[in-house]
Amino acid sequence: MKRLILFAGMVYLLISCAGSPGFKDGKGDMDWQLFRGDAALSGYTDTPLPEDPVLLWSYKGNTRTVSSPVVDKGTTYWCDKKGHIQGIDIKGNPAFSYDLNTAVEATPMIHDSILYIGRIDGFLSAVSLSKKDTLWNFETMGQVSATPNTVNFEGRKSVVFGSYDNFLYCVDARDGFEINRFESGYYLNGAVAVWKEHVIFGGCDSWLRIINTRTGMPTDSLLLDAYIPASPAIMGDFCYVGDYSGNIYELLLEKGKIVRHKKIMKSTNENSSFVSVLSITSETLYALSSERYLYSINRKDGKVNWKYLLKGNVGESSPLVCDDKVIVCTKTGIVTILDTQKGTLKWEYDTGEQIVGSPAIIKDHFFVLTTKGTLLCFGNK
């Protein structure tokens, strides 16, 4: 049986009545509270990158991490593998420190000044950034490596996340009590994408599933050609996802159903795969392949606008589109910025350390976190 542990002094979150993803509410230009920027995991922001970025400062956390950085009110947070949550302010000074005292391999989510994070020991923890205290822990029977997401419905703000115990959980954000759950049949490793009152996720069993968060019941599913290593990305009523054999799929969604689907890009190489989350704009799809190419793909006809060969091994870091530029990191440690129209190289920086997480973007700054726990802040000269 799942158990919920509450802590004295717990504060309640503000609850708003809505029927849509919760990440649009109150997000300021100094916030990047989810690793893809929004609950749909679109990987798009209209916040422009610095025109001529330079390294403003770096902070060495000195403990390995696989997290992406998240930002709340200008302070950047992450958790290392030993369970130490760190917060560094916009000037590069330590501003927050909290120990979970357990192993962590997940990227946190921040919402309403609460940091939510999964743990290897099977718990999802809610930590108050103002109180520096754990509000509640929700226990599952498997490790939680997926980044949580949030959705609003019926006046309740809920947190949705997957576990290695094969369940997708929806819990009340204010107290951690379980609302519902769905058994997928396979462990859940990636973040779910939120579309209206539904969540969409793929798994190692090659199924892409749509779940209604009100009921915890599936509304539709689609079997892909190979297993799905990364989260889907959503723009409007269109969902895009890549599989491990190198295909990219487009799905049109309506009332919780897949009304149409097609391969917008077919694999041409048996060694090709897509292991990072796609990025979407109104006209274009950006995909990072295991062959080290970043692709720009026309959403209307599936034609490749351009492709750019990156330096070194690409890893799991996902690209982000920032207005008219796209930023991407490689596992080798190279940060690259390209023009979205022609794929022209605009800027490049070698961190000298491996990167597996995605950047975080705020006004006039962006942040990159290496696997050694070094946080780098870039901005204008």
Name each model-derived stretch:
Residues 351-381:
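Blade-level signature of beta-propeller repeat domains, shared across WD40, Kelch, NHL, RCC1
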Residues 33, 75-78, 86, 115-117, ...:
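Conserved beta-propeller blade signature
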Residues 89-93, 128-132, 172-175, 212-216, ...:
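Short loop/turn segments that connect beta-strands within beta-propeller blades
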Residues 288-295, 307-337:
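Loop/turn-rich, solvent-exposed surfaces of beta-rich toroidal or solenoidal domains
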Residues 25-29, 36-39, 51, 57-70, ...:
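Extracytoplasmic beta-rich repeat domains
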